[in-house]
A protein has these predicted regions:
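The feature captures the beta-strand-to-loop junction immediately N-terminal to the Walker
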Residues: 46-49
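Helix-to-loop junction immediately C-terminal to a conserved catalytic motif
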Residues: 61
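ABC ATPase NBD Q-loop/coupling interface
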Residues: 70-84
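Q-loop/switch helix immediately C-terminal to the Walker
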Residues: 100-117
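Conserved ABC ATPase "signature" region
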Residues: 109, 124-141
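Hydrophobic anchor residue at the start of the ABC signature
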Residues: 159-160, 187
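A short, proline-enriched helix->beta-strand linker immediately N-terminal to the Walker B motif
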Residues: 164-168
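Catalytic Walker B motif of ABC-type/P-loop ATPase nucleotide-binding domains
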Residues: 170-173
Length: 236
């Protein structure tokens, strides 16, 4: 069981490479990607279709073992120590994995029972649920059935689920997909705030270049899984 460093989690990525079988040989979908992400940074990965955005993020999160290269969390090799480190990692997929026919609070309670340590008391669970609802600005919707939430609210609910276990490292796959511009900006501001106030390193894949000024760092992926840029949003 790995405790998060109070200063947050920094990531060092060295030579991440992935090839898949293709007609006439192999196709490179990650091409020796190396980069650094500082503790508590909010980072967006952008790029064209098929540039390897989600592949890179999944490799960085440790959930894809079929890559070569190394990812270090505060100096610890993520792939070699994944079973120890996975408790500090939150991952929100593009499709919301939440039940529609129960209230938000009930869904969070059931999830907390699974995700939080077994000796957590009911009172501690209740307090944590209230805390994560405040973080994602859904406190007033706690008794709402999930099917009645808007698209943006459902995405926040998915984020709340992953926040229950208090991960220090947080990955999101296209969290703003399908949201209107106002809702998208609101969600981006929430993520930016989480990275600073809750001391979380947040990495997201996005198809849009709107609101990137809210990020600390932008990673641009190019054709063939090549890293084209990694730096401040002001620099590209």
């Amino acid at each position: 069981y790995y405790k998060v460093n109070p200063e947050g989690i920094a990531l060092e990525v060295h030579d991440l490479n992935k090839e898949v079988p293709a007609k006439g040989g192999k196709k490179t979908i990650l091409d020796k990607v190396s980069l650094s992400i500082g503790a508590n940074e909010f980072v967006a990965i952008i790029g064209g279709s098929g540039a390897g955005k989600t592949t890179l993020m999944t490799a960085m999160s440790g959930f894809d073992s079929k890559v070569t290269g190394h990812v270090y969390c505060n100096g610890t090799d993520l792939h070699e120590n994944f079973q120890t480190l996975k408790n500090i990692i939150g991952f929100v997929p593009q499709q919301d994995i939440i039940y529609e026919n129960i209230t938000l609070k009930k869904m969070l309670y059931y999830t907390a029972k699974m995700k939080m340590p077994q000796d957590t008391s009911n009172q501690e669970i209740e307090e944590r649920i209230e805390e994560v609802l405040r973080m994602v600005e859904l406190s007033e919707h706690k008794d709402t059935y999930i099917r009645r939430l808007s698209g943006g609210q459902k995405k926040r609910a998915s984020i709340a689920v992953e926040l229950l276990a208090n991960p220090g490292l947080f990955f999101l796959d296209e969290p703003t997909s399908g949201l209107d511009p106002g809702t998208e900006e609101h969600l981006m501001r929430t993520l930016s705030k989480l990275s600073k106030e809750q001391e979380k390193t947040i990495v997201m894949v996005t198809h849009t270049i709107n609101n990137l000024d809210l990020c600390d760092k932008v990673i641009i992926m190019g054709y063939g899984g090549r890293l084209c840029y990694c730096g401040s949003p002001a620099g590209f």
